[in-house]
């Protein structure tokens, strides 16, 4: 853009200089190029070449850019983990407490990656809701693991909102946790309340089924009701007919029994 403007201004200067140089060489006053006409010619040339692209000096200031929004800080679930804590695989090792300070520092969370910190957070959530020390497969433990993963997905998507693949995985994990919470609420309500309280989960009921009413649906519904009523009427008539036949059969059988006893 800058090179184009420079090129056009150079061409314009050369064209104007050529007009005046021809006038000097002829040493005659050109009636067609008076001072006013030359200025008008110059203005016309400027307006012709710079109508679409104004010069850099006279270009108007446009306030089209939107102000940059500051992202709100998303609280991380790993903030409460101290850097002096040992990793999960070394926390239960007695020898890790008596090693050299340099070696012990290498085993802490200060030199741990994100997955190791997330594993320790999962173990902390599991310890809050598990039924006993050896419980690793109950519904409460599964809900705790899924909760840690969901919060990790939320933190990641807050930094990278265009990551559609992880968003899909997060929604699938949320649906799986809803299914487990629904089962736990139906079978063990006391454990369900404990899990929601300890993990900070707000359980919301699924929305009621809603279908938009259309003319086609109304016509189909009216036809189905008409068919249902007709079928019920035919079944009622058939039942009445069967009752009448049964009563006639009983009446005929009762009338023949006294004759047999008299004989």
Swiss-Prot record:
Q: SMART domains annotated for this entry?
A: Ribosomal_S15
Q: Which keywords accompany this UniProt record?
A: Mitochondrion, Ribonucleoprotein, Ribosomal protein, Transit peptide
Q: What GO molecular function annotations does the UniProt record carry, in alphabetical order?
A: structural constituent of ribosome
According to the record, the residues making up region (Disordered) are 238-263
Q: Which Pfam families match?
A: Ribosomal_S15
Q: Cellular component terms, GO, for this chain's entry?
A: mitochondrial small ribosomal subunit
Q: Does the keyword Chloroplast apply?
A: no
The subcellular location is:
Mitochondrion
Organelle targeting sequence: 1-70
Q: Where is the composition biased (Basic and acidic residues)?
A: 238-251
Query: Biological process (GO) annotations?
Result: translation
CDD domains (alphabetical): Ribosomal_S15p_S13e
Signal sequence region:
none
- InterPro entries (UniProt xref): Ribosomal_uS15 (IPR000589), Ribosomal_uS15_bac-type (IPR005290), uS15_NS1_RNA-bd_sf (IPR009068), uS15_ribosomal (IPR052137)
The similarity comment for this entry is: Belongs to the universal ribosomal protein uS15 family.
Please give the subunit comment from the record: Component of the mitochondrial ribosome small subunit (28S) which comprises a 12S rRNA and about 30 distinct proteins.
Annotated HAMAP family? Ribosomal_uS15_B
Entry protein name: Small ribosomal subunit protein uS15m
- Which gene is the coding source of this polypeptide chain? mrps15
């Amino acid at each position: 853009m800058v090179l184009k403007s420079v090129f056009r201004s150079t061409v314009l200067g050369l064209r104007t200089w050529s007009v005046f140089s021809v006038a000097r060489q002829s040493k005659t006053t050109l009636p067609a190029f008076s001072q006013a006409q030359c200025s008008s010619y110059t203005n016309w040339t400027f307006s012709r070449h710079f109508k679409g692209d104004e010069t850099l000096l006279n270009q108007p200031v446009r306030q089209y850019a939107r102000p940059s929004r500051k992202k709100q800080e998303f609280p991380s679930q790993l903030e409460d983990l101290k850097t002096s804590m040992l990793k999960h695989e070394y926390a239960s090792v007695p020898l890790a407490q008596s090693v050299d300070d340099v070696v012990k520092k290498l085993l802490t969370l200060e030199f741990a990656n994100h997955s190791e910190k997330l594993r320790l957070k999962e173990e902390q959530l599991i310890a809050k809701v598990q039924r006993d020390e050896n419980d690793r497969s109950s519904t409460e433990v599964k809900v705790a693991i899924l909760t840690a993963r969901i919060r990790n997905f939320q933190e990641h998507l807050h930094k990278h909102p265009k990551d559609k693949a992880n968003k899909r995985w997060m929604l699938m994990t949320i649906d799986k946790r809803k299914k487990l919470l629904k089962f736990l609420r139906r079978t063990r309500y006391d454990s369900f309340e404990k899990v929601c309280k300890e993990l900070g989960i707000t359980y919301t009921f699924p929305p009621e089924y809603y279908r938009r009413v259309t003319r086609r649906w109304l016509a189909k519904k009216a036809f189905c009701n008409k068919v249902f009523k007709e079928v019920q009427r035919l079944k009622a008539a058939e039942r009445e007919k069967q009752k009448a036949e049964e009563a006639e059969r009983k009446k005929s059988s009762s009338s023949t029994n006294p004759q047999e006893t008299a004989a």
